[in-house]
């Protein structure tokens, strides 16, 4: 960090929770002047900068006893030595990152755009990692879409947590910039995000997430991403997690067997693999009902030739009681 000015260092510390906590603990005199650029520069120059970056080697060697030659051949001792070497490597790697690439410890803000649904303004979370476009139950009600909710398409959205899928709105007008685009929404419980713009819509309209220019480009139109101050506060401080991958939807019956509370999750990314279940039926929904129509395979093949997913085609035919035209309208 020797090539950085005190002001750059101050901004990096303020934007990095790890460094900020450490400064407050180990260098309170520096933490006290973090909001005063001039006082910070003076205090910084009076402190050996290397102190801020160095983690004492004794941190990981404390509690490690000395070993005799005979002990060195012990499996448990070898394992402890290996773990100490690994921890030292991790520490060295982190010190190198802080010194050479401090920006990697900064905050990454989510991508949001302004949209309108039935004349109601909504901040949509752009997520190319989610297969389906999501609408919260509250937002669907505010936008007047609950009357179009098809409750046969129920299930559970799985991600970091789980959330109950209430159904689908097969087509509703979505305004993005100057464009009016028909959109299919999966409506779920939860209030973390009003709307999530998933890969189905992004691919359908050949959208381009242009991070260099900070815009979402659709059919030549550029929709700017919202600035940090405009992002909904609930997601402004979301940290990346390894558990945020592998998002999917399971039928409600399968999810309830693996979790006592399938409505407790909050992650909105989904993978559309839910089968519609008949309203009022006491049977739990299944992935695909057993085929009773001898021409079902040929109908699925026709829908697949139109560009639809085979599993979704089978589910739509099941919901439409085998009617090919109705099933196609579900998928549009």
Swiss-Prot record:
GO terms for molecular function: aspartic-type endopeptidase activity; K48-linked polyubiquitin modification-dependent protein binding; polyubiquitin modification-dependent protein binding; SNARE binding; ubiquitin binding. GO terms for biological process: proteasome-mediated ubiquitin-dependent protein catabolic process; protein transport; regulation of exocytosis. Residues 291-332 form the UBA domain. It is found in: Cytoplasm; Cell membrane. The active site is at residue 127. The record marks 308, 320, 331-332 as: Involved in interaction with monoubiquitin and Lys-48-linked diubiquitin (Ub2). Keywords: Aspartyl protease, Cell membrane, Cytoplasm, Hydrolase, Membrane, Protease, Protein transport, Transport. Residues 251-264 have a biased composition (Low complexity). It is a peripheral membrane protein. The record marks 303, 306-307, 316, 330 as: Involved in interaction with monoubiquitin. The record marks 318-319, 327-328 as: Involved in interaction with Lys-48-linked diubiquitin (Ub2). Its EC number is 3.4.23.-. Pfam families: Asp_protease, UBA. Residues 246-298 are annotated as: Disordered. GO terms for cellular component: cytoplasm; plasma membrane. InterPro entries: Peptidase_aspartic_DDI1-type, Peptidase_aspartic_dom_sf, UBA, UBA-like_sf. Residues 275-286 have a biased composition (Polar residues). The UBA domain specifically recognizes Lys-48-linked diubiquitin units (Ub2), which is mediated by the two binding sites within a single UBA domain. Belongs to the DDI1 family. Recognizes and binds polyubiquitin chains. Acts as a linker between the 19S proteasome and polyubiquitinated proteins via UBA domain interactions with ubiquitin for their subsequent degradation. Aspartic protease. Appears to act as negative regulator of constitutive exocytosis. May act at the level of secretory vesicle docking and fusion as a competitive inhibitor of SNARE assembly. Required for S-phase checkpoint control. Homodimer. Interacts (via UBA domain) with polyubiquitin (polyUb) chains (via Lys-48-linked polyUbs). Has weak binding affinity for monoubiquitin. According to another report, has no affinity for monoubiquitin. This is UBA domain-containing protein Mud1. It comes from Schizosaccharomyces pombe (strain 972 / ATCC 24843) (Fission yeast). The gene is mud1.
């Amino acid at each position: 960090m020797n090539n950085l000015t005190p002001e750059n260092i101050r901004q990096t510390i303020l934007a990095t929770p790890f460094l900020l906590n450490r400064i407050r603990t180990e260098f309170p005199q520096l933490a006290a002047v973090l909001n005063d650029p001039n006082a910070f520069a003076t205090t910084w120059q009076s402190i050996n900068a290397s102190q801020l970056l160095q983690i004492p080697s004794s941190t990981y060697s404390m509690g490690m006893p000395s070993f005799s030659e005979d002990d060195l051949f012990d499996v448990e001792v070898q394992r402890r030595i290996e773990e100490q070497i690994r921890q030292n490597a991790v520490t060295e790697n982190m010190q190198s990152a802080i010194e050479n690439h401090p920006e990697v410890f900064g905050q990454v803000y989510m991508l949001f755009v302004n949209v309108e649904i039935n004349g109601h303004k909504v901040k949509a979370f752009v997520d190319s990692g989610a297969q389906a476009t999501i609408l919260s139950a509250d937002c669907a009600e505010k936008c007047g879409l609950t009357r179009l909710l098809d409750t046969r398409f129920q299930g559970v959205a799985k991600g970091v947590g789980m959330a109950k899928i209430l159904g689908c709105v097969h087509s509703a007008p979505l305004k993005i910039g100057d464009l009016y685009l028909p959109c299919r929404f999966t409506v779920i419980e939860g209030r973390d995000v009003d709307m999530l713009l998933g890969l189905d819509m992004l691919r359908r309209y050949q959208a381009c997430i242009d991070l260099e220019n900070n815009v979402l480009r659709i059919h030549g139109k550029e929709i700017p991403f919202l600035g940090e101050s405009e992002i909904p506060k609930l997601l402004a401080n979301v940290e990346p997690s390894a558990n945020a991958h592998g998002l999917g939807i399971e039928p409600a019956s399968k999810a309830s067997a693996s979790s006592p509370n399938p409505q407790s999750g909050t992650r909105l990314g989904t993978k559309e693999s839910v089968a519609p279940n008949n309203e009022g039926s006491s049977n739990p929904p299944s992935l695909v009902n057993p085929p009773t129509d001898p021409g079902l395979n040929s109908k699925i093949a026709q829908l697949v030739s139109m560009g639809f997913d085979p599993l979704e085609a089978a589910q739509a035919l099941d919901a439409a009681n085998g009617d090919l035209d109705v099933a196609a309208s579900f998928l549009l």
